């Protein structure tokens, strides 16, 4: 495998040449405790950014195996890592300068849902972490600015990887809570089948969103309270006792005046097929 020094030599050789020379950088390189892969190089600085990936060995990341030993936990922890990595990348995006998309560093944007994404994967057997992202290779016009890309690959990215993908530098309690929340949510879904329910809304849920174009919870909204006739109690693996409204199989009529929350409730139920991050309210 080529090393980071090999990549730097390529960049120094093609500096100030025409943009297509960037294609010489395609390949996989060893960067200390992680591997950098340059998978696709954009055709010019105004095109869609180049696609890269980073692989951190499990023995270097050191995320405890019990945090990804089930599908739901692995998905939740990978989601947490991706959000953390995205925050770090935002600090450095466009810090390297040039034309068009030069200097952009970005990864898939995450919404309120916790989903299985190819942008971040954890290999169950090895604990290896793979993150896929995009970088705008810098140029002035269509002339390569290799020095700016060296800043990205040798200064900015190592800092992002160090802070976001190594367990010792993470908020370890937050990672643990993300995994536990995923287990609790999965447990509720399993209980629905056993109890003959099709949906469950926990007491204290915040169902309204802050606007019609945002999925974030509304501030100062009135928390949901279950009617006594539909109240259900569950004991979750981590949170413990949880009460809320259980909707049974059959026909349930939702009635009320204008702006009483009928659509808000239905939209929350619709989104309930997906796990959500802590604090979402649903």
Language model features with spans:
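N-terminal accessory targeting/assembly segments
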Residues: 1-196, 207
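Short helix/loop capping segments that flank catalytic or ligand/cofactor-binding pockets
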Residues: 63-64, 141-144, 208-211, 255-257, ...
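Alpha-helical scaffold elements adjacent to nucleotide-binding pockets in ATP/GTP-utilizing enzyme cores
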Residues: 80, 156, 265-272
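Extended, polar beta-sheet/loop recognition surfaces of beta-rich domains
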Residues: 196-199, 204-212
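Short, flexible loop/turn elements at secondary-structure junctions
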Residues: 202-204, 234-240, 251, 273
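N-terminal pre-Walker A segment at the start of P-loop NTPase domains
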Residues: 208-243, 282
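Glycine-rich phosphate-binding P-loop
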Residues: 242-270
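Post-Walker A helix-loop "phosphate-sensing" segment adjacent to the P-loop in P-loop NTPases
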Residues: 271-282
């Amino acid at each position: 495998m080529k090393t980071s020094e090999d990549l730097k030599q390529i960049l120094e050789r093609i500096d100030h040449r025409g943009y297509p020379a960037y294609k010489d950088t395609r390949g996989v390189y060893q960067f200390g405790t992680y591997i950098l892969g340059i998978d696709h190089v954009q055709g010019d600085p105004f095109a869609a950014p180049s696609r890269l990936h980073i692989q951190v060995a499990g023995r270097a990341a050191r995320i405890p195996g019990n945090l990804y030993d089930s599908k739901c936990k692995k998905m939740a922890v990978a989601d947490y890592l991706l959000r953390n990595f995205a925050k770090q990348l935002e600090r450095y995006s466009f810090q390297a300068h040039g034309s068009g998309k030069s200097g952009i560093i970005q990864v898939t944007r995450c919404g309120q849902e916790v989903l299985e994404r190819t942008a971040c994967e954890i290999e169950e057997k090895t604990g290896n972490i793979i993150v896929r992202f995009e970088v705008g290779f810098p140029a002035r016009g269509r002339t390569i600015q290799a020095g700016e890309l060296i800043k990205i690959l040798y200064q900015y990215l190592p800092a992002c990887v160090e802070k976001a993908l190594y367990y010792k530098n993470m908020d370890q309690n937050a990672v643990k809570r993300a995994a536990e929340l995923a287990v609790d949510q999965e447990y509720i879904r399993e209980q629905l089948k056993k109890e003959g329910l099709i949906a469950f809304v926990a007491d204290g849920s915040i169902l309204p969103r802050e606007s019609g174009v945002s999925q974030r919870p509304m501030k100062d909204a009135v928390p949901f309270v279950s009617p006594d006739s539909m109240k259900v109690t569950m004991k979750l693996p981590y949170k413990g006792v949880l009460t809320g409204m259980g909707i049974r199989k059959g026909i349930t009529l939702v009635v009320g005046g204008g702006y009483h929350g009928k659509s808000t409730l239905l939209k929350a139920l619709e989104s309930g097929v997906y796990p959500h991050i802590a604090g979402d309210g649903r």
